[in-house]
Swiss-Prot record:
Coiled coil: none
Organism: Mycoplasma pneumoniae (strain ATCC 29342 / M129 / Subtype 1) (Mycoplasmoides pneumoniae)
Low complexity biased stretches: 100-132, 159-172
Cysteines engaged in disulfide bonds, as pairs: none
Protein name (record): Putative adhesin P1-like protein MPN_468
Length: 208
């Protein structure tokens, strides 16, 4: 069973390989927080995910298929993605979320949307993270013990792994050179442009 939606975000750093690395085929976990799903791929297999162009979104499919979150439509209950478990990647290669603990370095990405008011239920546990206002993207820290990964909002004294709060407003034209440059992917404006492009909301500039 898929833990995450691979065609939206594979949870690994930028690259055409499964984990953005070249070389022989290798086996790795599919970004699963439990590390219980494995997949093997060859280096010439292109993973067509948003992660490969610096932005991605993943959602806990396993929890969804387990009916952890449902909605009623027409008298029938349908499983839905739990908004408390959506995760966003921007500039995944250049924002390396490695955290060294007990001489072990992990490469998992753990950026979460944090909402001041949002909370959700996931597999019987309550979480205070939700895919709410992207302006409240907080800096997280990730701790890994065996196959278990815990992610919580970091404080100034923690070993920080992700972005601090994104700027409150990112206008499409605020930083065109950097946003459109393929040499500066750790760039919130570029990620915003890409997302706006997917949504068809970037204005077309006409040079008269």
């Amino acid at each position: 069973m898929l833990d995450y939606i691979p065609w939206i975000g594979n949870g690994y750093r930028y690259g055409n390989g499964y984990k953005g690395v070249a070389g022989a085929g290798h086996s790795a976990t599919n970004g699963s927080p439990a590390g219980n799903t494995s997949s093997t791929t060859q280096s010439n297999d292109v993973a067509p995910t948003f992660s490969n162009v610096g932005v991605g979104l993943k959602a806990n499919v396993q929890g969804t298929l387990g009916d952890s979150q449902t909605t009623t439509v027409g008298g029938h209950q349908w499983p839905t993605l739990d908004p408390a478990n959506l995760q966003l990647w921007t500039g995944a290669e250049w924002r390396n979320d490695s955290k060294t603990q007990n001489n072990t370095t992990t490469n998992e990405n753990h950026t979460k949307f944090a909402s001041a008011t949002g909370s959700g239920q996931q597999q019987g546990s309550t979480t205070t993270t939700s895919a709410g206002n992207p302006d409240s993207l907080k800096q997280d820290k990730a701790d890994k013990s065996g196959n278990s990964i815990s992610v919580q909002e970091a404080t100034s004294g923690d070993n920080l792994t992700n972005y601090t709060n994104l700027p409150p407003n990112l206008t499409p034209t605020s930083d065109w050179p950097n946003a459109l440059s393929f040499t500066n992917k750790n760039n919130a404006q570029r990620a915003q442009l890409f997302l706006r492009g997917l949504l068809g909301s970037i204005p077309v500039l006409v040079n008269n």
